[in-house]
Amino acid sequence: MGLENLKPAKGSVKKIKRVGRGQGSGMGKTATRGGKGQTARTGYKAKRGFEGGQQPLQRRLPKIGFRTKDSHIYSINVEKNEAIKSLEEITFSSLRALHHFPLYIEGVKLIGKDAKNLASKIKDERIKTSGQK
């Protein structure tokens, strides 16, 4: 047995699909594209989510969730965080560096027993302590 006698395993090599090469192939005339219409034309690509005229899934399902228009206040417990006590000046940017709170947060409220003692260090209008309004 030589290299010239080697063959691939039976069923491992598929015959390529040659479309539009005559009626005898079974894939002539319309070249497996069906009849006429938009999908038979070259360059046709359905939009993402298009379901052939049926109401798309993303429009059939109800909208969920609610993003309030009210201001978002982030609470930080001072008793659990010694790093805030060690700051000389408490600003919004310094608190953001310590606590990675989301960008949509508009204000910070310091809570806990020691929060009132830190009121003199606060240098930003967006920061309040418990007891302040």
Curated annotation (Swiss-Prot):
Molecular-function GO terms, alphabetical: rRNA binding; structural constituent of ribosome
Region described as Disordered: spans on this chain: 1-64
GO CC annotation: cytosolic large ribosomal subunit
A Gene Ontology BP annotation from the UniProt entry: translation
Keywords attached to this entry: Ribonucleoprotein, Ribosomal protein, RNA-binding, rRNA-binding
The family this protein is said to belong to: Belongs to the universal ribosomal protein uL15 family.
Main function: Binds to the 23S rRNA.
Summary of subunit composition and partner proteins: Part of the 50S ribosomal subunit.
Protein name according to UniProt: Large ribosomal subunit protein uL15
Species whose genome carries this gene: Helicobacter pylori (strain J99 / ATCC 700824) (Campylobacter pylori J99)
